[in-house]
Amino acid sequence: MNNAPLTAISPVDGRYHSKTKALQAYYSEYGLIRYRVLVEVEYFIALTAIPLPSLKDFPADQIEALRDLYRNFSEDDALWIKETEKTTNHDVKAVEYFLKEKMTALGLERYLEFIHFGLTSQDINNTAVPLSLKEGIDTVYLPLLDDVIAKIKELETEWKDVPMLARTHGQAASPTRLGKELKVFRERLELQKATLIAVPFSAKFGGATGNFNAHFVAYPEIDWVNFSNHFVNETLGLHRSQTTTQIEHYDHAAGLFDALKRINTILIDLDRDIWTYVSMDYFKQKLKAGEIGSSAMPHKVNPIDFENSEGNLGIANALYEHLSAKLPISRLQRDLTDSTVLRTIGVPIAHSVIAFQSSLKGLGKLVLNEAAISTELENNWAVVAEAIQTVLRREGFEKPYEALKGLTRTHDKVTKTSVHAFIDTLEITPTLKEELKKIEPSTYLGIQLVGK
């Protein structure tokens, strides 16, 4: 057995490996170790910039050599650290020993004890994890979400003038435009994307219990709060939580996962609507030679992309829900439950990324069946009742709603002929009758909202 997709337990690394491999640099074990190395190195460099008395003579020409330790971090480096962890039984301590080994090779033995100086492992984890989370979302997740939004907008524009029967409670309702119905989803996604982007990527950096005890006892003259704010906010590009226990309180992380979950929920809504439109024959799907829809029924062309997307989004949301509910809770100054949970953050993001790609594929295969849409609209003349009774209200006609209810709320089919016959029975002017007869399901569409 090896690490090949065929033997992976999780489908995100197995069946869907080709769709998720871009996330490995951020959310794999290798990725986490590399980000820990990055934080340790940049922290050491920040100490030389103060400079601490013992680091005043640190050779400036070695700064970039230190950065190369994470820039050129290899799988062999990660394996060395994992092997060391077998002895230490502590993942962050193994990273510290790796860096000391590398610094020794660079001839920097004098400065070894300022690696991980004054820190606890959570100062590294609670900066490395949000940094990996931020960069993975910025680099992989958001561009894919933008692709989904762009595709919806493309179809929204293409189909902006297509009249369509709306359905509320599954029943025929006032007509709408297909493009506008897609705009609903696009607008919702854009709003939730803005909410997501506004959530800070928070980090904890303050020593064993958040008080800078070790830093302060060694160098009480240094403003460690100001130093740490600059290091976390400016050097790492994160948002330092000011007052903490041993760990980040994860309140912003919970907000982030909730925002990611809302985006997925909107896409589930879209997937289900498109699936339903396909079942109603509003859409055909582009055929691909060689593909099979059913092992038993040769005719089947199933909306599998939207089903795949919906399934993956549901799994992702279950995990996001646990992350946002669990992470802000930790016993006293810290328990270890956050550690194992944080290791799973890449999993719901991976399922989301798989879903985005499936939705994109499905949207790209849609072929509009205008004939079916038009036929259903024409078969539902009852929907013009709202328009007729509203115009009659305008004219002061007595009980127009009740009059139209008598026409339409029956088991008899309402047609253009029956509507026009009803209009002819009304005691109104010929001009008003003519106005009412011009109202049709295909033109009773309200305001054009696409492009507004």
Residue ranges and their predicted role:
Residues 2-212, 219, 223-230, 293-294, ...:
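A helix-coil-helix interface module used to build multimeric assemblies
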Residues 222-246:
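Active-site-adjacent "gating/activation" loops or surface patches in catalytic cores
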Residues 308, 312-399, 403:
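Long, amphipathic alpha-helical stalk/connector segments used for oligomerization, subunit docking
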Residues 157-179, 285-300, 331-340, 364-379:
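Glycine-rich cofactor-pocket loops
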Residues 57, 281-288, 357-375, 398-405, ...:
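A glycine-biased, small/acidic residue-tolerant capping/turn segment at secondary-structure junctions
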Residues 247-282, 286-287, 291-348:
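A conserved active-site cap/scaffold subdomain adjacent to cofactor or substrate pockets
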Residues 121, 216-220, 240-247, 373, ...:
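A structural signal for small-residue-enriched, beta-sheet-centric alpha/beta enzyme cores
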